């Protein structure tokens, strides 16, 4: 009798945590585990629920606690070998600097460790963190080896120092990002509201593989009549799985991975919307959906053969 053995991929996910709901680590952990990853979870904060609710309570971990857990515990004492580190919200400038320094050294010391960095700064024109964190993230992106960065539109604008309103703006922003941050191998901007697509009631998700192409690619995604929390965290987690998971012998291109991830995430958002409408009844205006229905979307998450959301368009840079 013969058997095929494979090693389960292991990821350290450093993000926020909520007791109720699905953002940060709660949006990443179950989907990654359900798709076969061994996930070590480091919670940078512990809140009752996310800040999109009217009220929340909880606490932030201190810089010393976070550093001790990663440096002395996981790496120093246990000597755990990770395939990937997925980092998101960190509560202050010092925590961001210290944790990024440890993760950066870990990735510099081993080609096998890939850093997926979600530079959590804010959204919709509003900062979630101290303004000093912008400069810290710029320094991190300049000096460390990043496998994939996943900013949203607002974060991309902060990182490159320009507004993005049109497709040409997006092209210039990607060019500037690559010039400023040459150690970042791949970038996906998880949501772009561009003037060319507003009449179509669509938004754009765009990417660039700095090592493999001179073209930006983008997918045009139909809008769902709702505001979601946690969708960006889910995209980052599912890109980690699609690009680095053990389901295939050869790594997919960033463009192909993003097409599959967008199909999966959009399917989850649509099912979440449909379940909310079933509970609330038909709605004429945009509804605020606080939490993704991840448990109810197990049938979507378990698929091995994920279709693409469509064919991407490309722009030469």
Swiss-Prot record:
GO biological process: pyridoxal 5'-phosphate salvage; pyridoxal phosphate biosynthetic process
Domain of life: Eukaryota
Keyword field: ATP-binding, Cell cycle, Cytoplasm, Kinase, Metal-binding, Nucleotide-binding, Nucleus, Transferase, Zinc
EC nos: 2.7.1.35
Residues involved in ATP binding: 190-191, 220-232
Entry GO MF terms: ATP binding; metal ion binding; pyridoxal kinase activity
CDD domains assigned to the protein according to its UniProt record, in alphabetical order: pyridoxal_pyridoxamine_kinase (cd01173)
Pfam families documented for this protein: Phos_pyr_kin (PF08543)
Cofactor(s) for this UniProt protein: a divalent metal cation
Main location: cytoplasm
GO cellular component: cytoplasm; cytosol; nucleus
Subcellular location: Cytoplasm; Nucleus
Residues noted as binding substrate in the record, renumbered to the chain: 16, 128, 233
InterPro entries in the cross-refs: PM/HMP-P_kinase-1 (IPR013749), PyrdxlKinase (IPR004625), Ribokinase-like (IPR029056)
Catalytic activity, reaction form: pyridoxal + ATP = pyridoxal 5'-phosphate + ADP + H(+)
Family to which this protein belongs: Belongs to the pyridoxine kinase family.
Note: Present with 6580 molecules/cell in log phase SD medium.
Function: Required for synthesis of pyridoxal-5-phosphate from vitamin B6. Important for bud site selection.
Designated name of the protein: Putative pyridoxal kinase BUD17
Organism, as annotated: Saccharomyces cerevisiae (strain ATCC 204508 / S288c) (Baker's yeast)
């Amino acid at each position: 009798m013969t058997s095929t053995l494979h090693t389960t991929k292991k990821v350290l996910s450093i993000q926020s945590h909520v007791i109720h709901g699905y953002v940060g680590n709660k949006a990443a952990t179950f989907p990654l585990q359900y798709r076969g990853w061994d996930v070590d979870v480091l919670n940078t904060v512990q809140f009752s629920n996310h800040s999109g609710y009217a009220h929340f309570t909880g606490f932030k971990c201190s810089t010393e606690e976070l550093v001790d857990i990663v440096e002395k515990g996981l790496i120093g004492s246990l000597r755990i070998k990770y395939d990937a580190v997925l980092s998101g919200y960190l509560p202050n400038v010092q925590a961001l600097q210290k944790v990024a320094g440890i993760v950066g050294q870990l990735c510099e010391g081993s080609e096998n460790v890939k850093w997926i960095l979600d530079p959590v700064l804010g959204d919709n024109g509003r900062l979630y963190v101290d303004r000093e964190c912008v400069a810290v993230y710029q320094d991190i992106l300049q000096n460390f080896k990043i496998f994939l960065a996943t900013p949203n539109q607002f974060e991309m604008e902060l990182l490159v120092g320009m507004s993005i309103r049109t497709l040409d703006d997006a092209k210039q922003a990607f060019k500037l990002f690559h010039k400023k941050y040459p150690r970042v191998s791949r970038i996906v901007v998880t949501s772009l509201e561009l003037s060319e697509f507003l009449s179509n009631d669509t938004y754009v998700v765009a990417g660039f593989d700095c090592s493999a192409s001179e073209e930006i690619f983008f997918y045009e995604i139909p809008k769902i009549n709702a505001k979601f929390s946690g969708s960006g965290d889910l995209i980052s987690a599912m890109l980690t799985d699609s690009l680095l998971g053990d389901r295939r012998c050869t790594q997919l291109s960033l463009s192909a991975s993003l097409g599959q991830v967008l199909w999966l995430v959009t399917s989850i958002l649509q099912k979440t919307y449909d379940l909310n409408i079933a509970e609330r009844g038909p709605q004429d205006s945009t509804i605020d959906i606080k939490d993704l229905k991840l448990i109810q979307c197990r049938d979507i998450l378990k698929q091995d053969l994920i279709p693409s959301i469509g064919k991407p368009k490309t722009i030469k840079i």
